[in-house]
From Swiss-Prot:
Homotetramer. Its EC number is 4.2.3.5. Belongs to the chorismate synthase family. GO terms for molecular function: chorismate synthase activity; FMN binding. Its cofactor is FMNH2. This is Chorismate synthase. PANTHER family: CHORISMATE SYNTHASE. Keywords: Amino-acid biosynthesis, Aromatic amino acid biosynthesis, FAD, Flavoprotein, FMN, Lyase, NADP.
Amino acid sequence: MPGNTFGQVFRLTTWGESHGPAVGCVVDGCPAGIEISEAFIQRELDRRRVGQSRVTSARQEPDQVQILSGVFEGRSTGAPISMLVFNTDAKPGHYDTIKHLYRPGHADYTWDAKYGFRDWRGGGRSSARETIGRVAGGAIAKLLLARYGISVIAWTSQLGDLKAEVIDESEIERNIMRCPDARVAALMVERVEQARRSLDSLGGVVEVRARGVPPGLGEPVFDKLQADIGKAMFSIPAIKGVEFGEGFGVAYMTGSTHNDPFVRRDDGTIGTASNHHGGILGGISTGEEIVLRIAAKPPASIARPQHTVDRAGNPAAIEIHGRHDPTVLPRLVPIAEAMLALVLADHLLRQRLARVDA
């Protein structure tokens, strides 16, 4: 099975299945000498962890990370960094009655069509539990980026038709929706609980930003920065849309309103007076804040009766019980941050190979 490794210089490989013994990752290409805080990696995993609130899955997993290689005396050695998280609360028995049925909205049918065989225990490799490796690897990327003054942040900006109206970043980790608008966050929690009671689920939007990114990152033509970021985001389970800057709003704009005038800043650097472009022009970073939004579909595992077929094509009814997220948004926030950090770390190191004075 190819496609388990992401990046060219700073590379992440993830492994493991939802109900297997463990999941994990290997980070290769991390320069030696980077301070690696296991506590920071654990905090990032805790933000992604199931069972953290009433708007997430009830599965109880400590997600305790173990660093197996590549770190000595708190610093990266330059060798591959391998990290492991054991699955301690897997309950494959929840899937016994539906293992021969194709769950609507899931990858069951497509994996069968591709491989002719699949791990039916919670989706196996296609489960979002695979993203543990992404968040752990993304934490390493964040530690590398921090040395260059680059930071990444994300938040829940929309749930259904509820949209954040105020952006107060200090509120993001103060509420279980990770929404920067405290008033709207409370409404979102109520909406999620309504959906859960109705045996349904909800989708929404997460906004992701990167700050301190220097101009010049990105590789034309096919490895444009937004192309690699787009691939990274679309590789996350449940993501159905990605937009940068004004996104699809550009369809309603003119060139004169969308163009961002270039200016000379007080410190002598060149920037733009506005940021409709979202920090990337021609596939290369401009030095402005990188701004993107990702749309997540409602989780497919719902307890409502649904129509489907079994592997033989026979009609069947299915109800998916067990422990599932009514919305992916709060746990998507750290995953999206991780993927953006991985792309930026990779392109930062690639840029250092592109010119001798980089």
